[in-house]
Amino acid sequence: MPQGLDSKVATRFPGTHLVSLADLDEYKKKLYKKDHASRCPGLVKVDFYGDAKPTWALVLISGENPKRKAELVVARQVDGDWEIRSLETTDGTPVVWREGPGKYEGLYEEEKTIHAPNPVIVFCGYGSWAIVYAWNGKEVEKVWLSD
């Protein structure tokens, strides 16, 4: 985690830690490593806002399964400080990665299609769900890719 962001996260989200490979069960660890090698499953650098400022997506967890809580946050460095936005909270031990700009169609008919001009954040609970988050220039949009 970048210097300065770690202390900001510790202050704002006490009692949490980044999801690591050690937090995943063997099956989920195998799935993650197959696609992402040995990268940290709870941290990814992503140009989410399209402004080239240092920006990271983090999955912070607290507690133990089956009562574990997870929160997806995006942190962007602006003028030397970190701007942190919470995108989602859920149960379990999800992972995060980035995908490129493009078209992302929602799983459900009522969901719109996102046309992401910048890289997107994928928040995934293996074997259960995956959600794509994109910045459209004004707000964060999300669609479910699987359920």
Feature roles, as predicted:
Residues 1-18, 82, 90-147:
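Acidic, small-residue rich beta-repeat scaffolds with periodic aromatic anchors
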Residues 46-56:
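Acidic, glycine-anchored loop motifs typical of Ca2+
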Residues 1-44:
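Terminal domain-start segments
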Residues 64-74, 128-132:
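Structural motif
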Residues 26-48, 91-106:
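Generic detector of solvent-exposed, compositionally biased contiguous segments
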Residues 41, 54-56, 70-72:
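Residue-level detector of short, conserved catalytic/binding motifs and their immediate flanks
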Residues 59-62:
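Beta-strand C-termini and the immediately following turn/loop, strongest in propeller blades
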Residues 70-90:
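Extracellular C-terminal loop/segment signatures of secreted glycoproteins
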